[in-house]
Amino acid sequence: AKYIECDATALPFEDGSFDVTISNTVAEHIEPSMFYSEQLRVLKEGGICLVLVASKGVKVEADCLADSNFERRFWEKAAKRDNTIEKYSVGKYRMNEAQLPVIMQKYGFKDISTGYAVIDLTPDNPKYSAEMAREMINAERYSALDAISAVRRAIPQYFSAEEFEEMTRLANAKYDARLAQYDSGEKQWDTAVSVTLAVRGVK
């Protein structure tokens, strides 16, 4: 396998190079005419374009994971100062489940179809092993720590080192508490259900 980092609006491939193209949570960040025209260009006749987009899901947190006043103030301050979303057009071109098939057809694809993949991550569900349940909880921990690190990279000038350290400590303490609840059999039934829309079109 070969990995190439490139511009999705100017792919470094000849016309008609591929039988299938797959994009995973990319389309919502790129101007549609530029994105779909490139997908169409690099596909062979009869080739398949698959566009995967995160759809609405369900998120219910355990009480022990609720933000403290310190954390709420931190995130409110970060939201006011950080322009990363606007700067990089994050989610600027997001469309709903009805609009996506229409836009794919508009830019040249035919035989459009859709499907959904649903994944539920509920640590307390007995269908999951203890190892898997702990991995779910820790995955949320890593996501929380990554979010703090993202603020540190984007706007470090607005926060002290002590604030970042405290945010990290609080995040770890919360997820340590959640793991302790799981290990003691104290069920919380917190859950994260992700829904991914797959739109399929043919050149």
Which functions belong to the PLM regions below?
Residues V51-Y142:
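Conserved catalytic/acceptor-binding region of the Class I
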Residues T9-T21:
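A short acidic, Gly/Pro-enriched loop at the edge of an enzyme's catalytic core
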Residues A1-A10:
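Conserved SAM-binding strand-loop segment of SAM-dependent methyltransferases
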Residues Y93-A98, S113-K203:
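Conserved Class I S-adenosyl-L-methionine
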